[in-house]
Amino acid sequence: EAPGIGIACIVAQSFGVPVVFAKKSQSKNIAGEVYSSKVESYTHGRIFDIIVSKKFLGPEDKILIIDDFMANGAAMDGLLEVIKESGAQVVGAGIIIEKGFQGGGERLRSQGLRVESLAIVDEMNDKTGEIVFRDDK
C-alpha cells in the first residue's frame, strides 16, 4: 500500500489527475460504503481485504493502476475486481519492478490488460544474490 503511493502521486501530477489508493484494512479515514476484495499476498503470506471508498471511484472514472512491485498478480486481480465493481474502466497498469519469473505480468497481459514495467526481473539467485533483468539476457 504505502510504497506505491509516492510513485502514484508523481504519475498523477504528471498527468494532472487525482490519486485514489486502496487500503489493506478498514481505517478511521475511510467512512461510509466501500468496494472491497480479498487478496492473498505472496510476499507476506496472508490474505487481506483491499478497500476503496465508493465516494472516490465510480463509473465515469478511467483508472491507471500504479504499483511498486508485481509478483504473481494477485494484488492486481483484487484491484481489478474492485474497479470492475465500481463500473470504472481500467486503461492500464504501471509497475516499477515486475518479478517476471512469477508470471503475474504475463498472465494479465494475456488477458488484455496493458501492463508496462520499468524493470522486469527474470531470475533471482538466493545463493549468489545475482539478479537477471529481462534486457540482460
Model-identified regions with their sequence ranges:
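PRPP-dependent phosphoribosyltransferase catalytic core
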Residues: 78-137
